[in-house]
Amino acid sequence: MPRYVPCILLCVVLSWAGIGCAPKLLGPTTPSGYRYTLSVSDPYLWINAPGTLPRSTAVIVRVQNAQGQPVDGVPVEFQIDPSWVQNASITPQRALTQDGSARAIFAPQTTGAARITVHVENIAHETAIVVQSYSPPQGR
């Protein structure tokens, strides 16, 4: 149990940081004045997990104009922290919004806390994803 304490504490901190009901509205960007939200479909992933546990996750950006309407055709860039480049992928790395949304799939190959940075015009924002190794329950 003591070896899992750091991972458990990291999960608790990340859960606490993401408790808000709605994603934080970021921006306005320059020059367009857009605002955007950043969310992750599954902030906790598992390596070597059975079929029901998530092994990859969608990183989702929603862009809106000053009136709150979704904006199409806005370039969004998704970047993995340099320390994760050899151990994970994010596809695509650039996307244009459709119906105000752009998404990329993050797929890790190792455990740890991965950071993804999203750029919309001049505004960048980070999110963290926790990747754990799956250990099947042991019989007693």
PLM regions with names:
Residues 1-21:
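Sec-dependent bacterial lipoprotein signal peptides
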Residues 18-140:
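The feature marks long extracellular or luminal low-complexity segments
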